[in-house]
């Protein structure tokens, strides 16, 4: 079990904090009856951290890279849903989520790249 607020593993910390923000944001969407997008965003946005966490117990280096690649894919999917929210009228502001996600996606990309060496 991991301490998600520890600075020992920055990607776990950032993705856990991001998941909490996604929960809060999707609750706002649901309160505005924007259920379909809320569910899509909730699933992909929280999956980034879940996959990064699962990678910590990978059976091999290849398994670790594979799980981190899934986290990267979920990051890209989340970026898509947030971009839709940003461009759609009457949706709550999500710029802060996009900014945090860009950082997370870059870190995951660097982790994957450095793990391949």
Predicted features by range, described:
Residues 1-54, 58-117:
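Short, C-terminally biased terminal segments at protein or domain edges
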